[in-house]
C-alpha cells in the first residue's frame, strides 16, 4: 500500500486560496495555519481561559463510551482530557448510514493524525474528538448510500420517512434496516472481508436504537485502536452543560446577527459566493417543539418559532433555557461558537464547504472575546483498487487524470489510436456531397409546387438521416471491436470519478473496507499522510 499527493495547484474555490495563497485571505482568520509556531500561540491563548465544565464533560464522555466494546484507548484519552492543560483536535459530521461518504472517515483520520502530531510538537496532551451532528433533522441527507450495479452507481435508500425529528432521537426502523443491509451486502462483491464486515454491521444494527447510535458504533469499530472520542451534539446531558453559553447567545442575539452579516459581506467582497446566505432575522438557534426541530427568528425584541404561533421575549427564552436546555440546538453559525466555548480546541478540521462558512465567523467569535479557531483542511483522498491500478500501469496513465474528471478524453483518444477508419470525415464528406447534389433537385421540386418543396425537404432530411445512421452504426461497431480495452477505461472512471464527482463524496466507507480490509484506516494512519491541503491517492 502506498500513497501520493497531487499538486495543490489543482485545487479550486476558496480552498485553493487558503492552501496556496494564505496571505490573500489571512484577514479572515486569527491564526495562520501554514506558519511555524501557531500551535504554541494557540496553546498559550487557551491556557488563559477557564474551562470550568471540563470535568463534567469528561464524566459525560466516560458514561457514553463505557458501553462500547474495545473502549480502552477511548478511556485513556478521556483520562488524558481531564488534565487541565489537555487540548483537543475536532471534526464533525452528520450521522450518515454506514458512516456516510468516505470523507467522513477521512475527517476522523485527520483528527487522529493531527492530535498525535501536535501532542509531540507541544509536549502536552492532545486528544482527537469527533462531533456527531445529532441535532440534524434532514433525514434525506443521511439515509442512503451508493452501490455499484453494473458500471453505474445507484442510490439505495433506507425506507424511513423524515418527520423533522433529530438524528439522535429518530428511531431506526429495524425491519427496513434489515432489508436495506441485505440489499447492500448483496451488492458487494464477495471478498475475504465481507463476512466479518457483515457480522460487525449486523451487531451494530441490533444494538443501536437511533441513527446517531448506529453511526457511532460503526465509527468506533473503525477507529477504536486510536481512541477516537465521540460527542453527540444533541445529547440532553450535554445540553445541560452548555446552558450558560446558550444564554450568552440569546442575550447577544442582536449583535450576533449584525456580526454574522458583516462577516459574510466581507467574504463575498473577496469574490466568493455566500456560503450561508440566510435572512437577517435568523437567530442562529433551533428550538424543538412538538418533537420537531424548528428555526428561531429574532425581530423587534422577540423570538419567533418558525411555522408556529410560539414566541418569546429574551427573558422568557432565557427562562426556557434554564428549564429545558435540551430543547435548544445550534446552527452553522453558533455551532462553532459552542464548540469554542465547550472544548479547549487546538484546531478544527474542516472540509471545503465548512472552511468557507468558518471564514465568515471572525467577527462573530470576537463578539464573545474569542479568536477564530485554527482551521486545518481535512484529508482529501481517492483510493485506487488493485484492478484499476493494474489497468493504469498497463497504459502508463496517471490516476490524477481520472480523479480530475478527464478520463473520457483519455478513453476517446485511446480508441482513436486503435483504428485508422476516418468515419467522421467520410460521413461529413458524404453529407456535404449529398447536400450539394440534392439542392438543385429540391429547388426544382419547389418550382413545381409548394407541396413538392416540403416533400423535397423531407427527402433531404431522410437521406441525411441515413448517413448519420450509418455513421453511428460504424462507430458502434468499432467500439464493440475494442470493448475490452474501453471497459478498462470505464472501470477506472467508475471508481476514480463516480457519477462525475469526487470519489470521497459518493462511495461509503464499507466499499473500501470490503476491498481492502476492516483495518484499512489504521493501516493508512500508520503511513502518516501529510496535511498540506493536497488531494491524496491511496493505492490499496
Curated annotation (Swiss-Prot):
Residue pairs linked by disulfide bridges in the UniProt entry: none
Keywords: Coiled coil, Ligase
Claim: Signal is one of the keywords in the record: no
Residues in coiled coil: 457-477
Molecular functions per Gene Ontology: ligase activity
Pfam families: CC_BshC (PF24850), Rossmann-like_BshC (PF10079)
Origin: domain of life: Bacteria
EC main group: ligase
EC nos: 6.-.-.-
Stated family: Belongs to the BshC family.
Function in brief: Involved in bacillithiol (BSH) biosynthesis. May catalyze the last step of the pathway, the addition of cysteine to glucosamine malate (GlcN-Mal) to generate BSH.
Protein name, as recorded: Putative cysteine ligase BshC
Annotated organism of origin: Shouchella clausii (strain KSM-K16) (Alkalihalobacillus clausii)
Taxonomic lineage from the root: Bacteria, Bacillati, Bacillota, Bacilli, Bacillales
Amino acid at each position: 500500500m502506498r500513497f501520493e499527493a497531487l499538486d495543490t495547484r489543482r485545487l479550486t474555490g476558496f480552498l485553493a486560496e487558503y492552501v496556496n495563497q494564505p496571505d490573500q485571505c489571512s484577514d479572515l482568520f486569527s491564526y495562520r495555519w501554514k506558519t511555524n509556531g501557531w500551535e504554541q500561540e494557540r496553546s498559550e491563548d487557551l491556557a488563559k481561559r477557564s474551562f470550568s465544565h471540563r470535568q463534567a464533560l469528561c464524566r459525560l464522555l466516560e458514561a457514553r463510551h463505557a458501553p462500547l466494546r474495545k473502549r480502552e484507548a477511548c478511556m485513556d484519552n478521556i483520562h488524558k482530557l481531564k488534565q487541565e492543560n489537555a487540548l483537543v483536535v475536532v471534526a464533525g459530521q452528520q450521522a450518515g448510514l454506514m458512516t456516510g461518504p468516505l470523507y467522513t472517515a477521512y475527517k476522523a483520520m485527520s483528527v487522529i493524525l493531527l492530535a498525535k502530531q501536535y501532542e509531540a510538537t507541544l509536549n502536552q496532551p492532545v486528544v482527537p474528538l469527533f462531533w456527531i451532528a445529532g441535532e440534524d433533522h434532514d433525514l434525506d441527507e443521511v439515509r442512503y448510500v451508493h452501490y455499484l450495479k453494473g458500471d453505474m452507481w445507484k442510490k439505495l435508500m433506507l425506507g424511513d420517512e423524515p418527520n423533522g425529528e433529530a438524528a439522535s432521537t429518530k428511531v431506526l426502523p429495524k425491519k427496513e434496516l434489515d432489508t436495506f443491509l441485505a440489499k447492500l451486502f448483496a451488492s458487494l462483491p464477495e471478498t475475504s472481508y465481507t463476512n466479518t464486515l457483515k457480522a460487525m454491521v449486523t451487531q451494530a444494527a441490533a444494538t443501536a436504537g437511533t441513527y446517531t447510535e448506529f453511526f457511532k458504533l460503526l465509527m468506533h469499530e473503525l477507529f477504536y485502536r486510536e481512541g477516537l472520542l465521540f460527542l453527540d451534539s444533541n445529547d440532553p446531558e450535554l445540553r445541560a452543560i452548555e446552558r450558560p453559553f446558550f444564554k450568552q447567545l440569546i442575550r447577544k442575539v442582536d449583535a450576533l446577527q449584525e456580526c454574522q452579516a458583516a462577516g459574510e459581506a466581507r467574504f463575498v467582497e473577496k469574490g466568493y459566493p455566500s456560503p450561508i446566505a440566510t435572512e437577517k432575522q435568523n437567530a442562529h438557534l433551533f428550538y424543538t417543539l412538538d418533537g420537531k426541530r424548528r428555526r428561531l427568528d429574532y425581530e423587534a425584541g422577540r423570538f419567533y418559532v418558525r411555522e408556529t404561533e410560539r414566541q418569546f421575549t429574551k427573558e422568557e427564552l432565557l427562562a426556557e433555557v434554564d428549564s429545558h436546555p435540551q430543547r435548544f440546538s445550534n446552527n452553522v453559525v453558533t455551532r462553532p461558537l459552542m464548540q469554542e466555548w465547550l472544548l479547549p480546541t487546538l484546531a478544527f478540521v474542516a472540509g471545503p464547504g465548512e472552511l468557507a462558512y468558518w471564514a465568515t465567523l471572525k467577527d462573530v467569535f470576537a463578539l464573545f472575546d474569542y479568536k477564530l479557531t485554527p482551521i486545518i483542511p481535512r484529508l482529501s483522498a481517492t483510493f485506487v483498487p488493485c484492478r484499476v491500478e493494474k489497468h493504469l500501469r498497463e497504459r502508463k496513465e496517471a490516476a490524477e487524470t481520472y480523479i480530475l474528471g478527464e478520463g473520457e478524453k483519455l478513453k476517446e483518444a485511446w480508441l482513436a489510436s486503435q483504428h485508422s477508419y476516418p468515419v467522421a470525415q467520410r460521413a461529413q464528406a458524404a453529407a456535404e456531397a449529398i447536400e450539394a447534389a440534392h439542392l438543385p433537385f429540391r429547388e426544382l421540386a419547389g418550382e413545381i409546387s409548394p407541396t413538392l418543396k416540403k416533400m423535397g425537404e423531407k427527402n433531404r432530411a431522410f437521406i441525411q438521416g441515413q448517413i448519420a445512421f450509418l455513421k453511428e452504426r460504424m462507430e458502434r461497431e468499432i467500439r464493440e471491436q475494442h470493448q475490452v480495452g474501453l471497459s478498462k477505461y470505464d472501470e477506472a472512471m467508475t471508481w476514480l470519478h463516480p457519477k462525475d464527482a469526487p470519489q470521497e463524496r459518493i462511495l461509503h466507507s464499507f466499499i473500501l473496507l470490503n476491498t481492502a480490509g476492516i483495518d484499512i484506516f489504521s493501516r493508512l494512519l500508520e503511513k502518516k499522510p501529510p496535511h498540506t491541503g493536497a488531494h491524496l491517492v491511496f493505492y490499496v
